[in-house]
Swiss-Prot record:
GO terms for molecular function: ATP binding; CMP kinase activity; dCMP kinase activity. InterPro entries: Cytidylate_kin (IPR003136), Cytidylate_kinase_dom (IPR011994), P-loop_NTPase (IPR027417). This is Cytidylate kinase. It comes from Thermus thermophilus (strain ATCC 27634 / DSM 579 / HB8). It is found in: Cytoplasm. The gene is cmk. Belongs to the cytidylate kinase family. Type 1 subfamily. Keywords: ATP-binding, Cytoplasm, Kinase, Nucleotide-binding, Transferase. One of its GO terms (biological process) is pyrimidine nucleotide metabolic process. Signal peptide: none annotated.
């Protein structure tokens, strides 16, 4: 494969796991836009910067030289030489990342970082196939009911299912402006499917 594949979807739709597996099968790097937004949220929390302070947050990100290391097996985010990756999937980051991702300046900053990576690659996020890589050769949008997505996330986090579902519904409401399928994307409800089945479905469409 020599082009770009985009895999978009709401939170906990399985897009990250699918994108990693698809990238590995194709032998190309995997790009996670969400990891950059999470890094911005984490750094804002750690530095005491208001997540809604666009100017202050951009100054922080540029000053730390935040960058994404794209690899087929997963991504890492570095800031001033420090690997932040293990700090980015926490309930605290979950609760502020949507506010950070709504800032136009931060979205532009993330998009610049992503566009620095030469194709081929598999990119996952919420608007990869619409705002970032509209020229992608293959576009997919994965979704599932809020209940299914909350159940998946609760298995990964030390949180009760009910709390995860509440957080997820709030995030869906905040993210709905950014999270919509491209007109030419293939849409798949993954609720009744295994990871292997979703990966096989995506690969089958790419290899047609």
């Amino acid at each position: 494969m020599r082009g770009i594949v985009t895999i978009d979807g709401p939170s906990a739709s399985g897009k990250s796991s699918v994108a990693r597996r698809v990238a590995a099968a194709l032998g190309v790097p995997y790009l996670s836009s969400g990891l950059l937004y999470r890094a911005a949220a984490f750094l804002a929390l750690r530095a005491g910067v208001d997540p809604g302070d666009e100017e202050g947050l951009l100054a922080l990100l540029e000053g730390l030289g935040v960058r994404l290391l794209a690899q087929a097996e997963g991504n890492r985010v570095l800031a001033d030489g420090e690997d932040l990756t293990s700090f980015l999937h926490t309930p605290e980051v979950d609760r502020v990342v949507s506010a950070v991702a709504r800032l136009p300046g931060v979205r532009a900053w993330v998009n610049r970082r992503l566009k620095e990576v030469p194709p081929p690659f598999v990119a996952e996020g919420r608007d990869m196939g619409t705002a970032v890589f509209p020229e992608a050769a293959h576009k997919f949008y994965l979704t599932a009911s809020p209940e299914v997505r909350a159940w998946r996330r609760a298995r990964e986090r030390p949180q009760a299912y009910e709390e995860v579902l509440r957080d997820l519904l709030r995030r869906d409401e905040r993210d709905k402006a950014q999270s919509a399928p491209a007109p030419d994307a293939l849409v798949l409800d993954t609720g009744g499917m295994t990871l292997d089945e979703v990966v096989a479905w995506v690969l089958a469409h790419i290899r047609r």
